[in-house]
Each structure stands twice: as structure tokens, then as C-alpha cells.
């Protein structure tokens, strides 16, 4: 009984961020840090909180000691590298040469390079920072790690930042040591290969939303085109033909007319590549031929295009709420009331217009609600909690429902205006008629693909069937039956 009572109630184990338990050595392992900048301070804070004994090497320890946690020992660089086997090099590339005097003391140790070059430095040097550090200290083992983790993520913990730590190096044991340290700190290590991969890893923090560049340019291009079109119709035409000054509409009214057009076309462009891919597979009779590069890139950017569509739809809703707040709108109401009095009409009520307004506003709210659901489920944490069938149902089925609701919203908004001559200003059709072309083609194509003759064939192709793929299977020689042919 006494033996049971002698056991500690809580074992020396830490809980990782994913819920698993990681053993912590009885004696805290000692880790060295060379550097006293922001990243070095955040790294020291995280290491101390994870149970490591931290020694910080600084050129002026008295001045920087107050910036580090009290449990971290701040001393001169020579003393900091004497005992730890793992040393984080948290200095810039141009300062690597200042560490050459420590080469003898660093021999045989693991150097973890956490630096990132600037865009200019990356273009100037052929070697990555990690490879350059390895060339200066050939007796050391250099591992590239933690360069994609920000100082804030180190301080706040992996729950508030990116959990992945990209690691590359030439020695497996050294990478394993750094990986275990990353796990103890609550991060998820990801092996990126040899040290030659460091150049690619160092380029990651320099990228500015690479997957958003083309969708953003597309959205801006559509906005400029539709804005210019609406400006000609709503502002320029009245000024030239009727000498009416309506330039006050440019900041809000013309923008609000443009936003739904951009959102609607972008939503159509999310589902158009799927239609083109299905048509291409039906034409080829196989799924084993690669799509053209332009279609492949288009398919990969659907998420960004959809989120931009949601963004413009939300702006359209907010701008619409602001329309009654305009001074011009109040003047229009007063002028309408004066005209009603002069016409000696006690009640102004157009049943058709009332129903049209009620219906198209309701459809617009429903479409925005569907887009909101699509945007929420595209968040990685929520998307990862869904299985493939659930995710496909939300993004494909409900997304197509959102496109249908948007089309009905646009049709009820336009009503009969497309057939009225006075709405063709400068012989230009109403803007909504231009936006309807692409969605109607997509809806028609989707309807055709639902026909049994096309639906069954497309399903077979996506399950591996090929139109011209006749595979011959030969039975054993002693078998009574002859040759058999099967289509795969």
C-alpha cells in the first residue's frame, strides 16, 4: 500500500495541442539561443513554458536580460554555446560571420536556423540562409526550422497560429531531435527533406497570398468593367441626352448597382469550370487525360473566387441598407409626394411593383444566407470536421441552390425591363441582362447532365470506365472456356 501512495498523482507528461501526451524528461534539457531580438525572446518564452532550460547568448547580456523570461539564463555567447547540444541561431544572415569565433565550441552541435531572407536577399544569393550557415560551420549539423512560425504564434501558442513547423536537414537524427522539441512546444513538425529544400521553405514567408492574386485581379477587372458600363447608362446618358446632372450617384448608387453584378458573375465562375470539366470528360470518354492547364488552375481557384463573390454580395447588402439614408433619396420621396398631391391622388399603390419588390428582396436574402453558409464551411477548421459527402453536399448542392436563388433574384429584379425600349440607354441593354447569360448557360448544362443518358455515362467515366478501353483477360490454359473480354 505504501508503494502505491509513493507514486505521484500527476506524471511528468505534457498534453500536446492535439490531445496526445508527450513525455518530458526528468531533467529539463538545455537549449541555447544565439540572438536577442523579438523572435529570440518569443522562442525563449515558449521553450521555458514547455519545460526546457534556456540559455541565451547575447553580446550585451546586462542590457537584454530584462527582456527575457526570468527562468531563462542570459549570458555571453561563449558561455551560452558551451553546454547545450541544440542551439537556435536567431540572427540575420549578415551577422552569421560574427559567430565564426565560436566555431570550435559549436563543433558537433545541432544549429537550428530560424532566419528568413528578404526578397532582395533571396534574389542576390544562390544559397539559402541555412546552406550558407552550414558552409560557415562544416563541423555542425544545420537544421532549418521554425522560420514559418511568427513571433506572435510562439508566444500565444499553436492554438492562435499555424501549428505546422517545416523542418529540413541532411541528418535524420538531428531532424528527429528538432521534431521532438517542436512537439513538446505544441507544434506539428513536417519533414520537408534535405537541407537543399531550405531555399523553398525560406520562400514561403515571402509569399503574399499567391492563390488570391488571379481571383482578386479577376474581381477587380469585373468591377471596373461593370462600373464603367453602369456609369455610362446611369450618369453619362442622362447628362448628354437630358442635361441632368446625376454625378452624385457615382460614390454609392452606381457602386451598389455594380456590386451584385460582380458577385453574381463570380459565383457563376465558381461552377462553370465543373461544367466544362464534365463536358470534356464526356467528349474524351475517359477521366485519365489531364485537363488543360488553364482549366486546372481555374478549378484550383474556385474557393477564392467563391469567397470574393460572398464579399461583394455582403457589400451589396450593406450598401443597400445605406440607400434610404441618402439625402437624394429623401428629396425623391418629397418630390414624389408633391407630384401625388398635384395629381390629386390620395393613394399610390401598384400591386405588381409591390409583389415584385417583396419577392426579389426575399430571394436576395435567401441567396445571401446560402452564400454565408458556403463561406463558413470553407474555413479549414470547419471543413476538416466534415466528411467528404457532407462537404460535397454543402459546396456543390447548396452552392448550386445559391446560384439558382441568385438567378431568380435577378430575374424578379429585372421583371419586364429587358423588353422595354426606354431601358436601352445608348442602345445598351440593362446590366442585369448581361449577368444572366453565364448563369443560365450553367443551369441549362447542369440540367442536361442530370438526364439519365448523360448522368450514367458521366458516373461510369468517373469510376474508371473508358469508352475505348477494352481489356482482354486470358483464363488459364486448362480452363474449358476460351478468351474473355471485359470493358474497364
Swiss-Prot record:
Enzyme Commission code(s) on record: 1.16.1.-
Post-translational modification, as annotated: Proteolytically cleaved by RHBDL4/RHBDD1. RHBDL4/RHBDD1-induced cleavage occurs at multiple sites in a glycosylation-independent manner.
Residue positions with a glycan: 256
Topological region Vesicular: 229-258, 326-358, 412-433
Principal cellular location given in the protein's record: membrane
Membrane-protein topology: Multi-pass membrane protein
Residues in Ferric oxidoreductase domain copies: 259-407
Keywords: Apoptosis, Cell cycle, Copper, Endosome, FAD, Flavoprotein, Glycoprotein, Heme, Ion transport, Iron, Iron transport, Membrane, Metal-binding, NADP, Oxidoreductase, Phosphoprotein, Transmembrane, Transmembrane helix, Transport
Membrane spanning stretches: 208-228, 259-279, 305-325, 359-379, 391-411, 434-454
Residue(s) carrying Phosphoserine: 11, 17, 20, 486
Identification of the protein by name: Metalloreductase STEAP3
Organism: Rattus norvegicus (Rat)
Gene behind the chain: Steap3
Amino acid at each position: 500500500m505504501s508503494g502505491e501512495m509513493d507514486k505521484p498523482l500527476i506524471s511528468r507528461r505534457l498534453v500536446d495541442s492535439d490531445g496526445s501526451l508527450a513525455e518530458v524528461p526528468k531533467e529539463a534539457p538545455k537549449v541555447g539561443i544565439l540572438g536577442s531580438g523579438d523572435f529570440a525572446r518569443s522562442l525563449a518564452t515558449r521553450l521555458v513554458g514547455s519545460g526546457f532550460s534556456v540559455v541565451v547568448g547575447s553580446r550585451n547580456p546586462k542590457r537584454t536580460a530584462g527582456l527575457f523570461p526570468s527562468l531563462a539564463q542570459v549570458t555571453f555567447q561563449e558561455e551560452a554555446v558551451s553546454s547545450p547540444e541544440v542551439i537556435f541561431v536567431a540572427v540575420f544572415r549578415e551577422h552569421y560571420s560574427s559567430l565564426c569565433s565560436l566555431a570550435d565550441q559549436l563543433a558537433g552541435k545541432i544549429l537550428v536556423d530560424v532566419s528568413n531572407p528578404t526578397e532582395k536577399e533571396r534574389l542576390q544569393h544562390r544559397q539559402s540562409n541555412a546552406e550558407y550557415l552550414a558552409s560557415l560551420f562544416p563541423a555542425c549539423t544545420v537544421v532549418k526550422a521554425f522560420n514559418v512560425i511568427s513571433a506572435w504564434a510562439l508566444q500565444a501558442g499553436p492554438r492562435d497560429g499555424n501549428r505546422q513547423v517545416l523542418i529540413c536537414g541532411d541528418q535524420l537524427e538531428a531532424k528527429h531531435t528538432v521534431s521532438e522539441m517542436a512537439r513538446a512546444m505544441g507544434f506539428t513538425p513536417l519533414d520537408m527533406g534535405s537541407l537543399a529544400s531550405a531555399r523553398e521553405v525560406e520562400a514561403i514567408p515571402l509569399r503574399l497570398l499567391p492563390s488570391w492574386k488571379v481571383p482578386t485581379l479577376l474581381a477587380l477587372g469585373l468591377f471596373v468593367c461593370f462600373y464603367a458600363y453602369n456609369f455610362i447608362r446611369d450618369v453619362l446618358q442622362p447628362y448628354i441626352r437630358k442635361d441632368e446632372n446625376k454625378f452624385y450617384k457615382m460614390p454609392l448608387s452606381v457602386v451598389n448597382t455594380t456590386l451584385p453584378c460582380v458577385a453574381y458573375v463570380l459565383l457563376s465562375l465558381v461552377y462553370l469550370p465543373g461544367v466544362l470539366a464534365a463536358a470534356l470528360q464526356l467528349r474524351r470518354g475517359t477521366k485519365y487525360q489531364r485537363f488543360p492547364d488553364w482549366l486546372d488552375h481555374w478549378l484550383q481557384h474556385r474557393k477564392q473566387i467563391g469567397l470574393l463573390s460572398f464579399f461583394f454580395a455582403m457589400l451589396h447588402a450593406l450598401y443597400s441598407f445605406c440607400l434610404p439614408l441618402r439625402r437624394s433619396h429623401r428629396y425623391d420621396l418629397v418630390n414624389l409626394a408633391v407630384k401625388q398631391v398635384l395629381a390629386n391622388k390620395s393613394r399610390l399603390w401598384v400591386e405588381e411593383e409591390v409583389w415584385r419588390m417583396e419577392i426579389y428582396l426575399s430571394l436576395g436574402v435567401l441567396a445571401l444566407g446560402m452564400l454565408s453558409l458556403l463561406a463558413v464551411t470553407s474555413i479549414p477548421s470547419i471543413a476538416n470536421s466534415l466528411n467528404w459527402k457532407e462537404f460535397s453536399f454543402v459546396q456543390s448542392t447548396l452552392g448550386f441552390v445559391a446560384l439558382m436563388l441568385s438567378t431568380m433574384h435577378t430575374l424578379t429584379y429585372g421583371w419586364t425591363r429587358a423588353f422595354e425600349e426606354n431601358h436601352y440607354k445608348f442602345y445598351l441593354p440593362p446590366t442585369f441582362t448581361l449577368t444572366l447569360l453565364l448563369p443560365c448557360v450553367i443551369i441549362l448544362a447542369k440540367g442536361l447532365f442530370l438526364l439519365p443518358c448523360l448522368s450514367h455515362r458521366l458516373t461510369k467515366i468517373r469510376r474508371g470506365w473508358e469508352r475505348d478501353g477494352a481489356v482482354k483477360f486470358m483464363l488459364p490454359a486448362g480452363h474449358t472456356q476460351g478468351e474473355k473480354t471485359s470493358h474497364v
